[in-house]
Amino acid sequence: MRESLIAQNVAMDSITRLAPAAGPLPAQRLDESGRAHVDQRAVLALALPLMANSAVQIILNLTDMWFMGRISTRALAAVGAVQWLVIVAVLVLGGAGTAVQTLVAQAYGARRYHRAAQAVWTALWAMACAAPLFVLVGAARHLILAPFGFDPAVEQLAAAFWFPRVAGACIGAAVWAMLGFFNGIGRPRTTLLVSIVTTATNAVLNQEFIFRLGWGIAGSAWATNVAQFLGLAFALALFLGPGYRARFGSHLTWRLQRSRLVQQLRLGVPMGLSPAADLLGFAIFQMMQTRLGTAGGAATQIVVILTSLAYMPGFGIASAGTTLVGQSIGAGARGWAQRVGERVILLTACYMGGIGVLIALGGPWVLPFFTGAHDADARPAIALGMRLLWLAAGYQFFDGLNLGASMCLRGAGDVRVPALLVLGLSLLLFVPLAHAFTFARGEGWVGFLPQLGWGAFGGWIAVLIYIMVLGTTLFLRWRSRAWQRIHL
């Protein structure tokens, strides 16, 4: 009986796919003369909960950094040295999860609801298969960190954080897959609810694991793992609830289909590789600053966290682009996808540019919050951080172009060329520039590059150049409309 029901649902999905979906298009408003306009209210109705969800992620990051600062400035620098690299590992190994929002949005726009639920289960199967790889990468902490030449005390702290954080990151990747489903069907408030539960749990467990149990820096990683596990359980309970079972057949599509898994990996791996390449460059950049000294590493980490006030909500707006573009394409309206995508890109760039300036203006009051007054490295870290915030403010508009364009391209399934562009710019432009600008002669990892010795300030000049080039390049890729020839 169940098999026949599944077959019937798949058949209905196939019939629906043959014709564009009827009804109004995503975020579309018709005026009195029948002309179509982008409904700004509809865009914001989707974007604002996603921005709020990103704000919750900011609170999570700030809470973690506050707990690290309570341990020591050295612990703060250690986490900063590996934080980006941890996310890179998750993006590369958890690529199938990042594809969920695109597949769900296009399936939802085409009214293929059971296909949308199937994308979630396929991602969860992929995460289960990849779990041993997460553990192996986590266990290789010393092999991965040794070549970067950290201060021994910083490396020891970073290694203590690395293993539990990476080994348990498959849980976080599974949570991303679940949230991608809710975002793809245009229900970001559910995503927000799951994130609030996870963040509140993480804050409580940080205090318990780090200080009361005495686990130190590793306790923060374990707190994140446990909190994400509870968030995953909560999201699954919602996904398998009566409403989703009735419309999406979420309880019927759990069986693994190899063809779907391969398709999702082909889409998800380059989709994960694009931000992974970007963050890999930032991870290496962060390690350069930590290699220079505790003050530079800590200042860079604090600035990164503060600029997330622009980045994370900007990511929320851009995520709305993935959903709106994907749903429009699923409905057979690629021209409308172009219009609504450009509106999202503009909103993202303007928001991030404005917030970047406000953060720099508020730096003198905010920076001291992240360091302990008793710490000898606190004062130089704060002084350097104030200068770095203005450099960071300079690239926020272009980072908005980068985020908005990349997420809209993701909604269209255009992921391979953008991944190659980001990989090339990150490793062939950004990393060499950061090395040349940061290190003086004899300080760096290699000797064949110019070594100007501008320190952390020089490294952030390289960030400014890189983001300006990257944002412009991806925006031109979107404007080229090459994505309109892609069919998933």
Which residues fall in each region the model found?
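Short alpha-helical transmembrane segments in multi-pass integral membrane proteins
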Residues: 2-49, 104-170, 201-204, 210-269, ...
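Membrane-helix interface/capping residues of multi-pass secondary transporters
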Residues: 65, 73-76, 113, 188, ...
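Hydrophobic alpha-helical transmembrane bundles that constitute the permease/transmembrane domains
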Residues: 51-62, 85-99, 135, 139, ...
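Helix-terminus/linker motif at the lipid-water interface of multi-pass membrane proteins
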Residues: 51, 55-77, 145-152, 208-215, ...
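Small-residue-rich hydrophobic transmembrane alpha-helices
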Residues: 76-135, 139, 172-191, 299-363, ...
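A late C-terminal transmembrane helix in Major Facilitator Superfamily
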Residues: 393, 407-434
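Small-residue hotspots at the loop-to-helix junctions and early N-terminal turns
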Residues: 73-84, 162, 221, 294-309, ...
